């Protein structure tokens, strides 16, 4: 991954409390997995930045290398990689996602 791509990824993570690297946008997800994570965050009423990896091939490949995670979407909360769709879904269902958001002081629907 080139430095420009790495810096772009790091900037998104550093400047957004909750950042979702996804296919499509929060209002128009382009895959079911991105839609699922977006919906979970919307149900919790968490403000988040959706980064459309389909707009930039280097970004799409780079985020996988950056996180050492092979799939998209990828969720970051307060600069920490949380996981992809399956992990986020499991955390949402068992209450762990809500707890992390609360513990990190992020506003959401309680």
Locate predicted features:
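N-terminal leader/targeting and pre-domain segments
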Residues: 1-19, 109-110
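Short, hinge-like loop/turn segments at secondary-structure boundaries
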Residues: 39, 67-68
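Acidic beta-strand-to-loop metal/phosphate-binding motif
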Residues: 21, 74-77
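Thiol-based oxidoreductase modules, predominantly thioredoxin-like and allied folds used
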Residues: 42-61, 70
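Local sequence-structure signature of Cys/Sec-based thiol-disulfide redox active-site neighborhoods
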Residues: 10-47
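Structural motif corresponding to alpha-helix initiation and N-cap regions
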Residues: 2-6, 56-60, 94
């Amino acid at each position: 991954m080139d430095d420009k791509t790495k810096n772009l990824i790091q900037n998104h993570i550093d400047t957004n409390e909750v950042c979702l690297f996804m296919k499509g946008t929060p209002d128009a997800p382009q895959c079911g997995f991105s839609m699922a994570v977006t919906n979970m965050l919307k149900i919790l009423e968490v403000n988040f930045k959706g980064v459309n990896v389909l707009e930039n091939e280097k970004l799409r490949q780079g985020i996988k290398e950056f996180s050492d995670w092979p799939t998209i979407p990828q969720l970051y909360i307060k600069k920490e990689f949380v996981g992809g769709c399956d992990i986020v879904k499991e955390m949402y269902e068992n209450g762990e996602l809500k707890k992390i958001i609360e513990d990190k002081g992020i506003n959401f629907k309680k």
